[in-house]
Amino acid sequence: MGQKINPISNRLGIIRGWDSNWCGGDNYGDILYEDSKIRKYLNTRLAKASVSRIVIERTLKLVTVVVCTARPGVIIGKGGQEVDKLKEELKRITSKEVQINIFEIKKPELDAAIVASNIARQLEAKIAYRHVIKVAIAAAMRMGAEGIKVQISGRLNGVEIARSEMYKEGRIPLHTLRANIDYALSEALTKVGLLGVKVWICRGEVYSKQDFVVQFASQRGMNRYEGSGDKSVKRRKRNGIKKNE
């Protein structure tokens, strides 16, 4: 299943949190639709700001929008003028007070959303896709990624029959839940049709194997030592032998 499921949703609560943090009652659907409108508006409005992720937090009277970007200066503007404009525009969508926080991404080469978006924009500029992908992979590995995989699908080079090509370097352990794997999908609109770009980036493991098992053993109703790899404890319990014996 690790090869099929979205790596981000498969690790929610372990590696990464939710993008929408709020509780809804009977108006749950309305709030969810409002979040969708906010994200769609910001992704269009900040198309040149290399936005990776938009996190929305809500209270009764305040909506907090956290924008993760590699180019915070484009969003903030001179003297914070652009942020003030964004607040007023989002107020009209939410009818509430809006607070915007900017989070700068220090290494955009290791962010799957930014990498996928950059590849898609270069494909729209008619740059050879193999060259674009190889440059992106080399940059990610140079910045410390343990592995990166890029898949491009569509009418590559304008051929009549669509196909998919995959390029990979390093390791992408999709079945390892403690592995910090980022994933993103982007689309490039070209003259010959739509090209899909998928990017997986492994940034390493957040927990060691033993720490991971110990931390999440209680959630599965396991004994702390049963999941720690202590074979002697398992053997004693299987044979009905007490520790002092």
From Swiss-Prot:
UniProt entry tagged with the keyword Lipid metabolism: no
Sequence ranges assigned to domain KH type-2 in this UniProt record: 38-106
Biased composition (Basic residues): 233-245
Pfam families with a match to the protein in the record: KH_2, Ribosomal_S3_C
Keyword line: Ribonucleoprotein, Ribosomal protein, RNA-binding, rRNA-binding
Biological process according to GO: translation
Gene Ontology CC annotation, any one: cytosolic small ribosomal subunit
Origin: domain of life: Bacteria
Coiled-coil annotated spans: none
SUPFAM superfamilies assigned to the protein according to its UniProt record, in alphabetical order: Prokaryotic type KH domain (KH-domain type II), Ribosomal protein S3 C-terminal domain
Region (Disordered): 225-245
One annotated GO molecular function: mRNA binding
Protein family: Belongs to the universal ribosomal protein uS3 family.
Oligomeric and partner information: Part of the 30S ribosomal subunit. Forms a tight complex with proteins S10 and S14.
Function: Binds the lower part of the 30S subunit head. Binds mRNA in the 70S ribosome, positioning it for translation.
Protein name: Small ribosomal subunit protein uS3
Organism listed in the record: Azobacteroides pseudotrichonymphae genomovar. CFP2
Chain's gene name: rpsC
